[in-house]
């Protein structure tokens, strides 16, 4: 039984960590922290957990976190870096859901996250494992510092990884169009995330320099064995949960459909969570966010365009589960020797 502390447990991601870990048979949650709600019952902030826990929020501190064997950090970008060195030095396993340890290049934090100086702990950047289980499974075994990928990066990387791995990416950068629900803005959000502004919206934001580009390019470069650049534009849309990405990859030689199935199965054939959706019949012939909500499932698909030598790829995930808390727990399971799907065996709800 692993004793777990969730630091920053009052937000959407923290709430999902609580929901998942309360169902995990190998975990005891010993603390859930929140400055704003310290002393309050967890279920009063996360009403869906009523009747499942009597935990109360406590003031966050290193000393509190050190009571656990494992700490999940669900903190804003730029905050985890203040916690990780002390926790890591103390021997506690850390699963960081912020971006603070995702990028291997210390200087990248100046460009992509507007830090005033390069990352202060370059040694820890190299020790951190990028927590995408299908692509880093061996590295995750026994890992003590895991950087959980970003939500839109998760969908984009898994969607394009087979093409990068098997040499289909040309010198023309892939174009990725992403759509994300309002929960991606967090529990506090901004004025444009209020219902009256968000309803009916399809709105681009950070259309040419979104920070998730850095980790997408980092991972695709690793898989391809050469520098990969992408064009990436996200859109806020009128749903609460979910991310849908469409990739346009212009190739020198169009693969056959049989080849595409072979590439996807070679990379993901053993995955408990990835489904390849490309059906000739049925009501959902390609990936659809609607059929992954509340789960750690990734639905991937593709189509071929011989007119333009274009491979069109698709990915659908729940941004709060596979894009954050669920992927963190999946990585935790591998690192700690639990079954990979422990706590994550939810079947999607339909209709919804």
Curated annotation (Swiss-Prot):
InterPro entries: AGPR_type-1, LysY, NAD(P)-bd_dom_sf, NAGSA_dehydrogenase, Semialdehyde_DH_NAD-bd. Pathway: Amino-acid biosynthesis; L-lysine biosynthesis via AAA pathway; L-lysine from L-alpha-aminoadipate (Thermus route): step 3/5; Amino-acid biosynthesis; L-arginine biosynthesis. GO terms for biological process: arginine biosynthetic process via ornithine; L-arginine biosynthetic process; lysine biosynthetic process via aminoadipic acid. Its EC number is 1.2.1.103, 1.2.1.106. SMART domains: Semialdhyde_dh (SM00859). Signal peptide: none annotated. One of its GO terms (molecular function) is NADP+ binding. It comes from the Archaea. Keywords: Amino-acid biosynthesis, Arginine biosynthesis, Cytoplasm, Lysine biosynthesis, NADP, Oxidoreductase. SUPFAM superfamilies: Glyceraldehyde-3-phosphate dehydrogenase-like, C-terminal domain, NAD(P)-binding Rossmann-fold domains. It catalyses: [amino-group carrier protein]-C-terminal-N-(1-carboxy-5-oxopentan-1-yl)-L-glutamine + phosphate + NADP(+) = [amino-group carrier protein]-C-terminal-N-(1-carboxy-5-phosphooxy-5-oxopentan-1-yl)-L-glutamine + NADPH + H(+); [amino-group carrier protein]-C-terminal-gamma-(L-glutamyl-5-semialdehyde)-L-glutamate + phosphate + NADP(+) = [amino-group carrier protein]-C-terminal-gamma-(5-phospho-L-glutamyl)-L-glutamate + NADPH + H(+). It is found in: Cytoplasm. GO terms for cellular component: cytoplasm. Belongs to the NAGSA dehydrogenase family. Type 1 subfamily. LysY sub-subfamily. PANTHER family: [LYSW]-L-2-AMINOADIPATE_[LYSW]-L-GLUTAMATE PHOSPHATE REDUCTASE-RELATED, N-ACETYL-GAMMA-GLUTAMYL-PHOSPHATE REDUCTASE, CHLOROPLASTIC-RELATED-RELATED. Involved in both the arginine and lysine biosynthetic pathways. NCBIfam families: argC. This is Putative [LysW]-L-2-aminoadipate/[LysW]-L-glutamate phosphate reductase. It comes from Pyrobaculum islandicum (strain DSM 4184 / JCM 9189 / GEO3).
């Amino acid at each position: 039984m692993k004793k777990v502390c969730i630091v920053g447990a009052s937000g959407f991601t923290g709430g999902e960590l609580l929901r998942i870990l309360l169902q995990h048979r190998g975990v005891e949650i010993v603390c859930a922290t929140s400055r704003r709600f310290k002393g309050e019952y967890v279920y009063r902030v996360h009403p869906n957990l009523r009747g499942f826990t009597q935990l109360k929020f406590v003031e966050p501190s290193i000393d509190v976190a050190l009571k656990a064997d494992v700490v999940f950090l669900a903190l804003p970008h730029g905050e985890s870096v203040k916690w990780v060195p002390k926790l890591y030095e103390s021997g506690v396993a850390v699963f960081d859901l912020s971006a603070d340890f995702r990028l291997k290049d210390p200087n990248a934090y100046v460009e992509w996250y507007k830090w005033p100086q390069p990352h202060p702990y370059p040694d820890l950047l190299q020790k951190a494992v990028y927590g995408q289980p299908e692509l880093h499974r061996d590295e995750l075994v026994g890992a003590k510092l895991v950087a959980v990928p970003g939500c839109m990066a998760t969908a984009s990387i898994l969607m394009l990884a087979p093409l990068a791995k098997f040499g289909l990416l040309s010198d023309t950068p892939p174009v990725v169009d992403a759509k994300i629900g309002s929960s991606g803005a967090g529990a506090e959000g901004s004025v444009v995330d209020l219902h009256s502004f968000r309803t009916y919206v399809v709105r681009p934001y950070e259309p040419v320099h979104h920070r998730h580009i850095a980790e997408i390019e980092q991972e695709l470069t690793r898989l391809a064995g050469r520098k990969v650049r992408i064009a990436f534009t996200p859109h806020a849309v009128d749903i609460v949960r979910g991310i849908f990405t469409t990739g346009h990859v212009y190739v020198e030689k169009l693969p056959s459909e049989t080849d595409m199935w072979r590439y996807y199965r070679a990379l993901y054939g053993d995955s408990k969570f990835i489904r390849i959706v490309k059906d000739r019949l049925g009501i959902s012939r390609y990936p659809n966010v609607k059929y992954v909500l509340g789960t750690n499932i990734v639905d991937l698909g593709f189509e071929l365009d011989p007119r333009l030598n274009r491979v069109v790829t698709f990915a659908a995930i729940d941004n709060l589960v596979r894009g954050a808390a669920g992927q963190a727990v999946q990585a935790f399971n591998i690192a700690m020797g639990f079954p990979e799907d422990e706590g994550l065996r939810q079947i999607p709800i339909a209709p919804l």
